[in-house]
């Protein structure tokens, strides 16, 4: 039981490290300007992204861009927005004026949302068009990988570009379960190359070390829990044996 838990943790650790590096590029990054993202920000995105081993396989099918629906809600009428700020005395003094102008205010409430709603819809359309223009390094229709995609942040052309290409393509085309578990060796070669160039891949190295520390802590906890479970089972079996003997 204990060994199976440690094997599962080790496999999950390898896949999670692979997915942390590759999933941001596979999902695509929206580009709102002609110039691509800076190298530092692109490299940092690999360090920030993290997914669980179970969700890695499903994430492969989320490569194409999706646009989110935006609900357009009219703002509150001007008079209603002022109501909470009115003092009690002011409300009494202006009661008559409010009564005389009530029809006009009701009309404003009906007209104002009509004027503002098209603006909100226009914004939603613009954002939807921007999301449609998102780029992804992998095209599931053609099965090709665009190594020049800005979402890769130049990783395919850096000092460890060849190692990155091997690991990334292995992860993309992997049919193993969980996805990418058969790319551990290529991923390790890429990580070793990163450590040979700490001036370029400082963020990746620091993030990997932090992830290793976290996984080691989790494995230690799993081992401790496994020992506790084994001890508990031994106690229960011993108690059951004594009860059977006395019976």
Swiss-Prot record:
Record: transit peptide: 1-28
Cofactor(s) recorded in Swiss-Prot or TrEMBL: Cu(2+); Zn(2+)
Ranges of the Mitochondrial intermembrane topological domain: 64-247
Name of this chain's protein: Mitochondrial intermembrane space import and assembly protein 40
Membrane topology: Single-pass type II membrane protein
Keywords, comma-separated and alphabetical: Disulfide bond, Membrane, Mitochondrion, Mitochondrion inner membrane, Oxidoreductase, Protein transport, Redox-active center, Signal-anchor, Transit peptide, Translocation, Transmembrane, Transmembrane helix, Transport
Residue ranges that the UniProt entry lists as topological domain Mitochondrial matrix: 29-45
Organismal lineage: Eukaryota, Fungi, Dikarya, Basidiomycota, Ustilaginomycotina
Residue ranges occupied by any CHCH domain in the UniProt entry: 157-201
